[in-house]
């Protein structure tokens, strides 16, 4: 899982970080509240630690990538 996120981060840094960086967080932010609201009950019972950890990690990695790029 970690390597997957790292790969994405590296690709973003190598390619158009600004475009991808702006597109990714925007899409994630719109999908986050909707998905969380609907799957909050289903996922909370099934995998409450697995699902929320993925989007949070992705967001943190993306932020780190954007912050790392001066």
UniProtKB/Swiss-Prot annotation:
Superkingdom assignment: Eukaryota
Which tissues does the record link to its expression?
Answer: Expressed in Testis.
What is this protein called in UniProt? Testis-expressed protein 53
